[in-house]
Amino acid sequence: MTIFVSCAAYRDTELPNTISSLIENADHPENLHIGVVQQCQPREKVDFSKNSHVREVWMASKFAKGAGYARSVAQSLYKGEDWFMQIDSHSRFDKGWDTKLIHMHSLAAGSASNSKIILSQFPKAYIREGNHDELVVNEKYPAHPTKQKVLWATRRVWSAERVEFDDQSYSVPEESQTVLAGFIFAPGSLVNDVPYDPDISFFGEELCYAIRAWTRGYWIYSPNEQVLYHFYTRPNHHKIWDAANNSDKKWGGLEKKSMDRQAAIYRGDILGTWGAPSLSLLNEYYEFINTDVPGIYNEMLNDRG
């Protein structure tokens, strides 16, 4: 079964190793089609011209508009593959990750009696030391599987926090409240049913996506086995909001537009393609996560005012 992998990168030196790890550790690399969006300087561009797995779009980093826009562009490279996977450009993979994810998706679909399942969770952690990777395991970054619940984060954006599995034997995937954008695995139908919003720049993207997916019948489960790694925080690596990459000060405007759009989605002012299909379904999701998202968000806006 074919897998389309969406990978957006912003001036990320980890990108080539991410793509190599993805392909080399798959049981069936012949089934992989990878949509890469490189946002970088011309001299930084990775040459994938001889990699038959990769379809790509390159844009100069000055035209970057955040993760949402880049992930939306990556989805435009999808060509009807059976499965859709979204990763960050600083990821690593365990052997057989593709076979394991398809199997765990089947387990989750069986538990839920619903084939429209999104697998998502916080990946394990790694860091790049010189020319090799090192696994990081500590209280903040455990190696065992966890679920996620919606969190009002310290940045005053909606994010997620880790929650332990109910079944500590980790026999089957368990339901979660929201997605992690750096690891999504679902049927390929997700691309057309829930296209990525290009106008949500970065912070807060995941709750809006979870709202749109869940209210369209896609339930979110966390895999019962960890199969990939993420380079968290990445000190001294390029970020689009860093001063050196934001000399024209456009990031603040993009984030303001993004936050306003998120608020409209939370309140139900935006319904349809870019929001929940209806207010009743939106409220069902808030009941599911047991959180008054628009109320908390409005309190924050009032505090700022």
State where each predicted segment sits.
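Catalytic cores of eukaryotic secretory-pathway lumenal/extracellular enzymes that build
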Residues: 2-299
